[in-house]
Structure formats: structure tokens, C-alpha cells
Amino acid sequence: MTTSSSGSVETSANSRPGTFSFASASFTDLLGGNAGAGGGGVSRYKAMTPPSLPLSPPPVSPSSFFNSPIGMNQADFLGSPVLLTSSIFPSPTTGAFASQHFDWRPEVAAAQSADQGGKDEQRNSYSDFSFQTAPASEEAARTTTFQPPVPPALLGDEAYRSQQQQQPWGYQQQPAGMDAGANAASFGAAPFQATSSEMAPQVQGGGGYSQPQSQRRSSDDGYNWRKYGQKQVKGSENPRSYYKCTFPNCPTKKKVERSLDGQITEIVYKGTHNHAKPQNTRRNSGSSAAQVLQSGGDMSEHSFGGMSGTAATPENSSASFGDDEIGVGSPRAGNGGGDEFDDDEPDSKRWRKDGDGEGISMAGNRTVREPRVVVQTMSDIDILDDGYRWRKYGQKVVKGNPNPRSYYKCTTAGCPVRKHVERASHDLRAVITTYEGKHNHDVPAARGSAALYRPAPPAAAATSSHPYLPNQPPPMSYQPTGPQPYALRPDGFGGQGPFGGVVGGSSFGGLSGFDDARGSYMSQHQQQQRQNDAMHASRAKEEPGDDMFFQNSLY
């Protein structure tokens, strides 16, 4: 509005000079004073004003306050073309005044009798009228900037008026509801985002879209996990990672599949935690999503059923990774298919059982690692005799070595020692033997020891250096009297033994190691040794003694 600090303005309606000075009266107060003096037309116009106009005066501004001099009627001032020209509410900031008088009160009466379409048209034409002053306060500007308008159709007329009266109005922002065509898109989008935030993606500050946090999957379930493997499975484009609970002797495992962008697509658990959830776990901002998964996991445990009746942990009703869990049904987390977990897992890892190489829990929850000894020997044969008895239970080819690795277990009952034997990749003559664990028993007697199979010497010959005297005939072998179910061979492998005796209620020299189960440990060397002992005993009987030679020479 082009006004000066002091001056006179000559109008066609009133030829009296007037001097304008700035005071505390506002434009709203002038409209209210004219309503009391001039009639009811102004009150009707006041009812048509935008509902967002403040009822309290704004701060002091040179361009928004003026005062009429003494003796000048406010009704005459409102009829002056200084404020209004021949058009309906043009901008008074052009500085050009019309030459003819214009009274806006008949226009108000005509506009009040028009229909709703006329009001919308008048509002559209009124949208050009705006003050170019600074906002009343920064708080008001922020409020009007970040609060989206809500259409009257969704709120109702009364609620819409009350909301518009409560919202502050800034001069730099176009009043809500003035331009219905331009804000049509915002009227439809704002309520959808306010009421359907779960269906529509949330808009981040940078303009990107992020999935709602309630729909994200997180691997943080409150327990501590250690990753021990990852591979690409058949039928899935996402890699699969394998985790094991770090608590000592806890059998719980899980596998996690992630997409290429890092999002978790599937989490499958196996086993039940045998301990409470640790307190000092590392939590992040996604802990709320983990709580959602925990509640869903408890439902999954009660729905599908776990392996035991103990308290359920998050999504623990599913399965592990096919190492030694054979034939265990494992419904996947999130569905009730009940498909087998071990369908695509290799069978070559069944030798590794739970807790192998992981340590033994001692008093005070201390974990003691099992000792591991690696021995390298240059040999042409794979089987090396170390004094213990072993049973082979597996073989596979490991990464980095084309030579197969064989796995053995100590045959002594209750002994936890295992070993695996393989040839080095750089030298085929080098045999690498790795021992895990410690024997809890003594070294068994050697298989080739004759003391296992020889009977105790007689009491009369116990003091002699040789168990048999030179002139004593060899003991007769045991001759079975019943029918012989096995053929006896004279070559020492199935024939009669040189020493008779009964061990444990059964004859010991009658049948060979190939025919008797007790003789499975007898080797060819032992048979040969027995034959040699028998031959030496027979020669001692046949050869004459030295005393007989001297007696014959005397005669």
C-alpha cells in the first residue's frame, strides 16, 4: 500500500483535505467501526472474510496501520477509492487511484445472495489480495508451512471453521481454501498419508522412500551369535549365512538369507536356548522391530511346537543346518509348511556333532578348549600306528586340498578323541594327522603282543629261563571231540594250535582267527611265531644231551 508518513490526499467524494498519521488503529478496527456506524452491510462483508484472518492486531508495521483525522467520518473513508477501485478488490499497491467514486456495499449485498459457485469465484478473485509484509512471528510461519490443509469435505463445516480459527495465518502463505484448483492434489494426498501410513511408504527428508519400520526384518533377537559359514544354496539367488549361539553348550543355531541390497528375507532357527537372554546385549535403533519379531516368534513356537516343552525363545521352532540333525522336521519361520530343513544340506558334515571342537563348560561357566595336536609324517601309507585303536566314520574333500580327508574316532567307550588324516597338497608323501581331544584311558595293549594269547607257564617251570624243559615233550594240542563246523587247514591259519588251553570257557588253539570271532586280532605274524615255538620244542626233544654223548664214548 503506497502511503507516506504525512501528506494530503484529494478525492472526488470528499474535497476536504486529510492528513494521515500512524496510530494504533488497525484495518480490522476500521472495519468494525464502520459496521457500527454505517449499517449491516459491512458486517456481512466481515462474515465473508477468510476465516484465517487474525482477530488480534499484528505487530507494529508502517504499512499496516493508519488513522483518520478528527472530523472525518470513517464511512466516508471506506468509500474512498484509496482502498477500493472499480474492480473487485484489486491490489492497492499499484499507486494509481481511480477517478470515479466506487461504493463496495452494493457489491457485498449482491455477492451475499449469490450461490456457492459465486462465492468460489469471488474467493478466486480475492486470492490476488495479499499483504507483502513480514510474517507476524517465526513460529507462525513454521506452523503454516508444515501443517497441510485438510479439505472441508472430510472434516465438516463446523470442524473446518474451528480448525481454521485455531491455525495461525502467515502473510507470505496463501490462505487455505482460496485456490481450490491448485490445492486439489494436496487435499487428496494429505489425509491418505495421515490415516494410511501403513499402506503408503514414508517419505524421508532426502526425498527417498523407506519401508515402514514395522515391516522390516531384523536379525537382532537379543541373543549373541557367531557366524561360522556362508554359501549359495540351490534354488535361491540370495546367499545364506549360518550362525551359532555363543553361549557355552547352547545348541541353538540359525540361518539368515539376505537379498542383494542387504535386506533380510528369511530367518530359520533350530533348537531351543538353554539359558536366559543376556542382559548386556548390543542394541540399536531397530530394537522395536526385533520386539515385533519376538512376539511373532513366540506365536510360531506355540503354533508349530518346539523340540522340548521348555520356555520358547524367538522363532526357535525351526531347524538347524544339517550337520548332525538327521530327520528333524523344521517349519520355517513365518509359514506353517513344515518342510524339512535338511533337504538341501550336504551329508558330508554329519560327522561333526554339536559341541565338537567348541569346548567343554567347566565350573564358573569357563570354557576350556580341547587340545589339538597336528603331526606331519613322511610315509607312503595313510594308516599310521600310534598305539590306539580307531574307527573310520567319514571322508570328504576339503577346500584347498585335492586329497581326501579321513575322519577317525577312538574305539574306547567314552573316549572323546577324534582325528583326521590327509595328505598335504604340496607333497603327497607328507601325511598330516590332526588330533582333537585327550584320551581318558591308558594305551591298550599292542595287537601283535603274544602275551595276550599265551597261557601262563606251569608252576614247576616258572623258575626256568625257557617255559619248557629240553627233555619235556611239548604239550598236546586240544583235539575237539564233537563235529567240526569249520574246515581245518594245516598251514597254521586254520589248523590246530601248538598250545592247548581254555580261555574264558572256550578253547584257545582249536580254531584260527579267520574262523573264530575271538581270533580276529590274530595276525599272520602271531601264527608264524607259534609255529616257530612248536618247532623249537620238538627239536629239543629229538636232540640228545651232552651227557649221553660222553656216556656212549666211554663204552
Swiss-Prot record:
Q: Show the GO cellular component annotation of the record.
A: nucleus
Query: Where does this protein have compositionally biased stretches of type Polar residues?
Result: 277-294, 310-320
A GO BP term here is: response to jasmonic acid
Mainly resides where? nucleus
Q: List the disulfide bonds.
A: none
The record describes the protein's role as:
Transcription repressor. Interacts specifically with the W box (5'-(T)TGAC[CT]-3'), a frequently occurring elicitor-responsive cis-acting element. Negative regulator of both gibberellic acid (GA) and abscisic acid (ABA) signaling in aleurone cells, probably by interfering with GAM1, via the specific repression of GA- and ABA-induced promoters.
Question: What is this protein's record name?
Answer: WRKY transcription factor WRKY24
Gene from which this protein is expressed: WRKY24
